[in-house]
Design a protein with these regions (language model features):
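A well-structured
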Residues: 1-311, 599-604
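C-terminal, non-catalytic "cap/extension" segments appended to globular domains
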Residues: 4-7, 14, 20, 115-119, ...
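Active-site recognition of the HExxH zinc-binding catalytic motif
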Residues: 250, 379-399, 420, 425, ...
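Long, K/E/R/D-enriched contiguous segments that form extended
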Residues: 293-331, 337, 341, 363, ...
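Short pre-active-site segment immediately N-terminal to the catalytic Zn-binding motif
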Residues: 313-316, 369-389
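Catalytic zinc-binding patch centered on the HExxH motif and its immediate surroundings
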Residues: 314-316, 349-371
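Short beta-alpha connecting loops at secondary-structure transitions
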Residues: 373-377, 403-413, 442-451, 470, ...
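Post-HExxH zinc-binding segment in Zn-dependent metallohydrolases
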Residues: 412-440, 448-450, 454, 530
Length: 605
């Protein structure tokens, strides 16, 4: 970066809570633990709502208010330690605090179980009576209904409590182990003639020099293979624990729970993947044209993020990326632009490219502070800028919901990914409209269509892999070698066998942290869902040509906290997600972008 940087690349955590190394934070955590234990004990005697008498409703209202306050504090603590641990992956103190907070999981399970078991006995009529008979409960009527639905994923009370206690040193411990292993991993690469060790997040595959991409790629494969056995244990035991519980619950299959968590019907998931499989062949035109522009017969895995040849092949500074995002969001709506500037200026974002950070990116919320924090590693590419816009989109979603009751600020991951990918769409379309020449427009379209490949092919390969892995895991542990075979098989199917024969990534099951998130299963299809939903919404905005669309979009974001996925879209935009129409509308946008890219790529202007 040339000259003095305008925007800080490091976040401000000190204004949120006391630093973890001090006594004040220790005291804060101890008080939280005590209050959590007391409320968990109180929850054991929470009455059933099978007979919603006025005194019972009042007791529930008071309990839910206490739970609201305690949940805010606990969420802030989790997010705070998570931020510190991500920014300093090898810090043992932060790892210890992560483990300590995880150990409180059984108390939280007691609380959520008490709510769900208490609601389980209530009929629809009783639940409606309950919400109309108490104003405070009426405000969170949808959340109560959703909690009653989630009670189907609960074992009998004593078994549920035992499972929660065992998960601390089982399910969630395997997730934490993966975080430590991947955080400590170093990839040995060549930089400017020197051999250096880099964190996974620092090793990029977007160099204009193919030899650099190939060397980085093969170095990454070698490094990840060195931890294959440990990661194989982790992924097997995470999946195995879940499958054991699913069997005890009598669930249809391993997709039942993810669908519950995403407030989504199986017909919707099937309609989405069916549309993707029927239409994604159009992406072969993009992959072929990009290979031609790069002088290759076929793209390999290391070429998917490669930049196109351009007379202006320089990167984009963090300051420039921030200004572009602010300007693009502001043209959509002043509130969106003002919010983006707020996150950047007030240092809600950590982007510094340095050793010792965890890989990946995230946005995490602090409901007690009504703020968010964003984590990523910015490496000066268009893809980095898109990731930044993506995470700011997440933060804006939380910002819109911040005045709602806490339990109506919770939204499923598929709808969370809609707001973030919509932000990327806003940035991309604004930049494309302002593109000055063929090379610039090709570069913008390349970024957009690389995202399409990620969401419609890469994420699909993850879904196919996890689906088949879970089916095989029912019969016992799956070896690392077999996991690699399943990964390549899934990639070939999802990418329509379009990459070079030696271009498949058999270590992707090891390097992709989404497979190891112990708190949520099948953390893959929400991305494709959110991507296509955001494109469809953007198409509605483009076609409507109405100045009131930003307000409709805001109402859509508010609805994500108090409706099912299908009702959120139906009430906001009038589409039935169980039918192919909306998904095809989204895929029409992708097809149009491919046509524009292929035409520009074949032009000599």
């Amino acid at each position: 970066m040339n000259g003095q940087a305008t925007f800080s690349q490091n976040w401000d955590l000190d204004s949120l809570l006391p630093h973890p190394s001090g006594d004040e934070f220790r005291q804060l955590l101890d008080v939280f633990r005590t209050d959590l234990e007391l409320l968990a004990e109180e929850s054991d005697s929470l009455p059933s709502l099978g007979d919603p008498l006025p005194e019972v409703l009042e007791r529930w209202a008071v309990f839910v208010e206490k739970l609201d306050e305690l949940t805010r504090r606990g969420t802030d603590l989790d997010a705070f330690i998570g931020c510190h641990a991500a920014a300093d992956a090898n810090n043992r103190l932060y790892q210890q605090f992560e483990a300590e907070l995880s150990s409180l999981g059984p108390y939280r399970t007691r609380l959520s179980s008490a709510i769900q078991f208490g609601l389980q006995a209530a009929s629809d009529e009783q639940l409606a009576e309950m919400c109309s008979g108490n104003e405070r409960l009426g405000r969170i009527a949808y959340w109560l209904k959703d909690q009653r639905s989630l009670s189907k994923l609960r074992l009998p009370r004593e078994q549920e409590m035992l499972a929660a206690e065992m998960d601390v040193d089982g399910l969630h411990a395997w997730g934490r182990l993966y975080d430590r292993v991947s955080g400590a991993l170093r990839i040995r690469v060549m930089e400017k003639g020197d051999v250096v060790d880099r964190s996974p997040g620092q090793v990029q595959f977007d160099s204009a020099d193919r030899s650099v991409r190939e060397n980085n790629y093969h170095a990454s494969l070698k490094a990840w293979r060195s931890v294959a056995d440990t990661c194989g244990d982790a992924i097997n035991h995470i999946a195995g624990t879940r499958l054991t519980k699913y069997r005890r619950l009598g669930l249809e299959d391993h997709l039942s729970a993810p669908l519950f968590f995403n407030r989504m019907q199986r017909e919707t998931l099937d309609a989405m993947w069916s549309a993707v499989e029927n239409r994604k062949e159009v992406l072969l035109g993009f992959l072929g044209s990009k290979a031609d522009l790069l002088g290759l017969d076929r793209l390999g895995w290391c070429d998917l993020q490669a930049p196109l040849p351009s007379p202006d092949a320089g990167g984009i500074s963090y300051d420039a990326a921030c200004e572009l995002i602010i300007e693009s969001f502001s043209r959509f709506t002043p509130e969106f632009g003002d919010f983006a500037r707020k996150t950047i200026v007030e240092r809600w974002i950590e982007v510094e490219n340095r050793d010792g950070k965890r890989q990946g990116g995230f946005c995490t919320g602090f409901p007690g502070q009504q703020q968010s924090r964003i984590f990523m590693t910015y490496v000066g590419t268009l893809d980095s800028m898109s990731t930044l816009a993506h995470e700011i989109g997440h933060a804006y979603h939380s910002f819109v919901l911040k005045e709602q009751p806490l339990f109506l600020q919770e939204y499923p991951m598929n709808l969370a990914e809609t707001a973030s990918t919509f932000a990327e769409a806003v940035l991309g379309e604004e930049r494309l409209a302002a593109g000055q020449d063929r090379h610039e427009q090709l570069g913008i379209l390349d970024t957009m269509l690389s995202d399409a490949v990620s969401f419609l092919m890469n994420i699909h390969s993850r879904f196919l892999f996890e689906d088949e892995f879970h089916r095989e895991r029912v019969d016992g542990e799956v070896s690392p070698e077999r996991l690699s075979e399943l990964m390549v098989k899934s990639q070939k199917q999802a990418y329509l066998d379009a990459l070079a024969e030696d271009g498949w990534n058999d270590t992707f099951w090891i390097s992709k942290l989404h497979f190891y998130i112990s708190s949520l299963p099948f953390y893959n299809f929400p991305y494709t869902f959110g991507y296509l939903l955001s494109l469809g919404i953007y198409a509605v905005a483009r076609d409507a040509g109405s100045v009131d669309f930003p307000s409709r979009y805001r109402e859509f974001l508010l609805a994500t906290g108090n409706r099912s996925t299908e009702d959120t879209v139906k009430d906001s935009f009038g589409y039935d997600l169980r039918e192919p129409d909306f998904w095809n509308r989204s895929l029409d946008v992708v097809a149009d972008r491919v046509r524009r890219f292929v035409d520009l790529a074949s032009s000599n202007d």
